[in-house]
Amino acid sequence: MVSETIWPTEAFLREIDIHKLLPQQEPFVMISKLVLLNNVRTVCETIIHSDNIFVEDGTLTALGLMENIAQTCAARIGFINYYLFKKEVQIGYIGAIRNFEIIGLPKINEKITTTVDVKEEVFGMTLAEAKVMKDANLLATTEIKIAVKQDNVYGIKSV
């Protein structure tokens, strides 16, 4: 059971190639490092680069912040599948976004920290609360529901 797992250290997580955990690949990767993972919380760090596809006029857009949150969720799912269940990366879908509030947007070369706290997981669905910080400054908060593509009993891929 995942909740009884001994979770990895920050040093181990920082050494992971984030590309192993995500279905997205460059130039669409919006997180740099996975820095904390346990049965409830996932934390990723990201440096905003000027070549990021969601940067406009030197600032990461709101859409970029949302994609960063979604990919933090994906990194959690990817770690669990790759390291615990020895499965390939699974495709996830945003099922719902609620109460997305933007307080500020980060600039290029700034580091943001995204924290996702799982509130409930059932039948391949994860309900979580997320926040994005730059240092001690809150940039965004939201509630997000993620669905993971599952195989059915006949082995046919379905959503």
Predicted regions mapped to residue ranges:
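Beta-strand-rich interaction surfaces with strong enrichment in secreted/lumenal proteins
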Residues: 19, 33, 57, 101-104
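Hydrophobic beta-strand-centered segment that forms part of the acyl-chain substrate-binding groove
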Residues: 11-12, 77-113
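Active-site helix/loop of acyl-thioester processing domains in fatty-acid/polyketide metabolism
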Residues: 61-86
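HotDog/MaoC-like acyl-thioester-processing domains
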Residues: 2-8, 75, 107-113, 117-159
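Small-residue-enriched segments and motifs
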Residues: 29-32, 92-95, 114-116, 142
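Extreme N-terminal tail/first-helix region
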Residues: 1-22
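Catalytic strand-loop segment that frames the active site of acyl-thioester-processing enzymes
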Residues: 25-61
